[in-house]
Amino acid sequence: AKNTDLIKEFNKGGDIQFGYGPHAPYTVSDATFEKIIDQAQANNTWIHTHLHETAFEVQQSMTDFGMRPVARLAKLGLFDVHSQAVHMTQINDEDIENLSGKKCHIIHCPESNLKLASGFSPIQKLYNAGLNINIGTDGAASNNDLDMVSETRTAALLAKAVAEDAEAFPAYQAMYSATRGGALAFGRDKMGSIQTGFEADMIAVNLDDLNTQPVFDP
């Protein structure tokens, strides 16, 4: 009820907006997820949950529910509403198929996943399946910092190793995921890009230092 009150108070087009954040499938019951899905639809907002973060989570779901977490949440209808799946390291082709064409956005937190040895998210495969990828940091306790520039660089480099393809997740795609992709994940259609009519949320980057060289845009 408190969450819904905040949504009704703040979700009026301002800079601060709220959604629902059920932690993860292994801490939230089907009944609670169903209530949250109904509330998100009624209040036209998003749902944010950690998903397929560890192998244990997937194994436990198979034991408790007889299906993988993505399949369970797909059955409940989570991905039919605006949703965000955080981490997504322990996934297979069936999981990707369950998400493809749905309203789910992927929040990739590579440095947190590395620190916790949780696994590697195949973000190029997810991107190829039509899913919106965006960059996150998780929390400082599992990351050491909340540096989005560092996180984006790590995402771009790690994706190449995971895909075994030097052309996977190139710099422009990584930058899009850190900006426009993130805006879309939170339903902010007028953010994340320099366009007429968009909100002018920008930073200036000094490219004169040696550590920014060479500057090359093919």
Residue ranges: model-predicted function:
Residues A1, N211-P218:
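Short, intrinsically disordered, charge-balanced linker/junction segments flanking boundaries
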Residues A1-T89:
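Metal-coordinating catalytic core of metallo-dependent amide/deamination hydrolases
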Residues E34, D38, A71, I96-E97, ...:
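Alpha-helical segments flanking ligand/cofactor-binding loops in enzyme cores
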Residues I37-W46, L78-V81, N98-I107, N128-I133, ...:
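Glycine-enriched alpha-helix->loop->beta-strand junction motifs that scaffold or abut catalytic
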Residues E53, P110-L114, G139-A141:
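Short, acidic/turn-prone active-site loops that include or flank metal/cofactor-
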Residues A55-M67, D95-S100, A117-L126, N143-K160, ...:
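Histidine/acidic-residue-rich catalytic or RNA/ligand-binding cores of hydrolases
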Residues K75-H82, Q124-D209:
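His/Asp/Glu-enriched, well-ordered alpha-helical/loop segment
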Residues S83-N92, C109-N113:
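Catalytic beta/alpha-barrel core
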